[in-house]
Amino acid sequence: RGIQPEALRAFWVELGLTQKDIAVPLSTLYSHNTKAIESKSPRLAFIRNAVPLALNGDVPKIGSIVSHPDTAMPPREYTIDQGVWIEQEDSGKPVRLKELCDIDANGNVESIDRSDKRAVIHWVAGGIPSKLVIASGQELVIVEGILENHNHPVGTIVQLERIGYAIVEEDGLLMVHD
């Protein structure tokens, strides 16, 4: 699911006709699919292994983040009440919360403007507990996390920041490919 017809056509045209037995990596198909869906896939944040982060200092409580860097999609709105969710692997170190602020290892706001080259991470304010289903060989891996609030209908293909493309399902997300 999620592979677009134009990606399949491009894949088969690139592969061509041959009598030789060849192995083709799925990454080739996924590359064609990315070209087909990238420009129309809104961004969303899904925080795996989510941990809460209290922000200390002057930080905007209401704001917006672009839904897609190259299109006129409406921005994603957020409200920060108690803090934000970040991935556990990102906690405990100075980082830049994407399009929000620079923080130290303890969540103290150091700058609203980007001040240095620290890692930029995604985050969710509020959000809803959700599951991301990933096909891994013959297994289905279920990753629990916090999904950014959104209004996308079931079946919408979205780009999960730092993860890959997924389809919005009634009860969570289904990974298409990274």
Which stretches of residues belong to each language-model region?
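Catalytic adenosine-cofactor/nucleotide-binding cores of aminoacyl-tRNA synthetases and other
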Residues: R1-D178
